[in-house]
Amino acid sequence: MTQAADTDIRVGQPEMVTLTIDGVEISVPKGTLVIRAAELMGIQIPRFCDHPLLEPVGACRQCLVEVEGQRKPLASCTTVATDDMVVRTQLTSEIADKAQHGVMELLLINHPLDCPMCDKGGECPLQNQAMSNGRTDSRFTEAKRTFAKPINISAQVLLDRERCILCARCTRFSDQIAGDPFIDMQERGALQQVGIYADEPFESYFSGNTVQICPVGALTGTAYRFRARPFDLVSSPSVCEHCASGCAQRTDHRRGKVLRRLAGDDPEVNEEWNCDKGRWAFTYATQPDVITTPLIRDGGDPKGALVPTSWSHAMAVAAQGLAAARGRTGVLVGGRVTWEDAYAYAKFARITLGTNDIDFRARPHSAEEADFLAARIAGRHMAVSYADLESAPVVLLVGFEPEDESPIVFLRLRKAARRHRVPVYTIAPFATGGLHKMSGRLIKTVPGGEPAALDDLATGAVGDLLATPGAVIMVGERLATVPGGLSAAARLADTTGARLAWVPRRAGERGALEAGALPTLLPGGRPLADEVARAQVCAAWHIAELPAAAGRDADGILAAAADETLAALLVGGIEPADFADPDAVLAALDATGFVVSLELRHSAVTERADVVFPVAPTTQKAGAFVNWEGRYRTFEPALRGSTLQAGQSDHRVLDALADDMGVHLGVPTVEAAREELAALGIWDGKHAAGPHIAATGPTQPEAGEAILTGWRMLLDEGRLQDGEPYLAGTARTPVVRLSPDTAAEIGAADGEAVTVSTSRGSITLPCSVTDMPDRVVWLPLNSAGSTVHRQLRVTIGSIVKIGAGS
């Protein structure tokens, strides 16, 4: 069970109190609730409204106990333990037992007999406690109260008001944890019910948690409703693949098909919460375009159609093509692969292909970022943890919007601000809704001005806070697009002594970094340029030497492929639309003589590949993700045996391919990869210095122009959300954000259409007038009607044209 919400024993030795429960003395920290003290003794007091991560409310009254000296039973979930208190639970007190039976009878008066068809049946606290702490029959003979059922809270959450027992778990979660007022208690007395605000848009990223913590079947998920009973399902622990938060999850499946995912209980990471994307976006792995067999070009013709073939034949064709291009092959690895798979790509590139041309950053990036990662992040023990965020004297965010880019970081920062008064500052163009929910403070900055803003913080009130032990600076991957941004963040950390954390958006990026999938890094954060580091890797891999010259980054690989300097590409799980210029990526693939793709589903990359190998989704393979903290999150396959897909883990495909090329890769299993990585360990030598890139400062747009800024929303047009229409239904409405003066300059009013354009395309969306710097325009990067990279062919920091109308 997660640490009780009412107890804070983080610092020093807590003051203790001693009480007696059912005749047994127990000492607990001062402030502990009676219900928690009973739990420590193994006594389970029935309850519905109580939740260890929510503030106590005493709404359901089911946890009544007898307390010596009190005139009537007290709710144990709101009663604080005190010295010499004597408590008797339902196990030893007839008064407590009778009170609990009476409350249960009242709760069941209007509760429908839906158990045979209710989704909660079989895992329902009300069902279980009605049996253990309720009457065997009902004395109520009148007609039960009824409501229309169900009503839509959102596209993915349904409310059955007849089943609701008014425990207020859902409303407290929305208010206390998520900060989204999407559900509340309405009316009073016998008319009281849970409802939504008619004039408020439903825009919570965390609504699915209310379904999970509902103690009855009042809140259900649209996608799972009437699909299965809990006792029909097999449950497997898993790890979320959608972002770098590293959430523990539970995957429930039946007959080889995943039916639902729930948040796992991990107090050190996601506590008991997850975001809606992690909960519901899993159907992408069962779409009709999933690749189920290896593919090659018909008759070996580069322009021929892709046709199914055997694994052995596909291996032979791929081995022949890659062997012919040895030393002239680039490796592009997406940021979604596991730690072990990334290691296999890094090792395959070096010893099988003889190249350091490998990069996991299939997105806008920079050489400065590579230097920053090598100097500050790779091969280092966990510098900042989730717990550190709660105890920090200050947290500074730059190039990072946690609610959209790492939702569990957002929840932890909101908790830190709300419960521990941790001040959160962000360097950004405007204050987002997420920042308001964290009670955060904005350091308003023009895109490109982040380095100057960071330098200015070295002195003053914020600088003093950052100089306090435990202070944290969190940088997102978007800061890589600002020249001098990461250098300034590192400089500020050095000046103040603050700890530095890097939060990528994708689940596999930190693991790929630690695995050495960068052109200048070897596994464990070893610098490629260091002779000792290369010697260590050579010894571990049982080879004489490694290629010593620094390789090309992703942009360099694509440019070299486009001009035919490179003869082949090995591509693992990239999306061209993630790059600033998707057309350039596709042109590079078209120009490459030989392309091997390892992919889950058909894509623009597989259409251009000469050999395609199907790879398995996370539900069908073992592996590990490394989250933003540097914490290793291992998982086993949830689905075993025969399924619809015949894909293998990337490392198994690469191991077999290396064998066909006459090279022993040595990673046929995740255990083998982990053993090698453990033997190598992290680099204990000198890390590269840097980065030291000078800032160029923000550009100056003319009238009718603006600097583009933006980020990807959590719920957008990403392919990992394919097949989940209910989730897409609650994505936030895409808008163009402009300052009042900029909107007036182009003659646009709030809500009117604004067009953002370049010489290569345009985007038209409603205008949202926002308090932000002038001649700056914000767009969601990959939402419906606003796929910036595909439509504009530029990325953030570029100058674009803006105008009213379409």
Curated annotation (Swiss-Prot):
Chain sites annotated for binding [2Fe-2S] cluster: 49, 60, 63, 77
Primary enzyme class: translocase
Domain of life, source organism: Bacteria
Names of the cofactor(s): [2Fe-2S] cluster; [4Fe-4S] cluster
EC numbers: 7.1.1.-
Chain segments annotated as transmembrane: none
Cofactor binding mode and count: Binds 1 [2Fe-2S] cluster per subunit.
Positions of the 4Fe-4S Mo/W bis-MGD-type domain: 233-289
GO molecular function, one term: molybdopterin cofactor binding
Domain 4Fe-4S His(Cys)3-ligated-type: 95-134
A Pfam family that the UniProt record links to this protein: Molydop_binding
Full protein name: NADH-quinone oxidoreductase subunit G
Organism: Mycobacterium bovis (strain ATCC BAA-935 / AF2122/97)
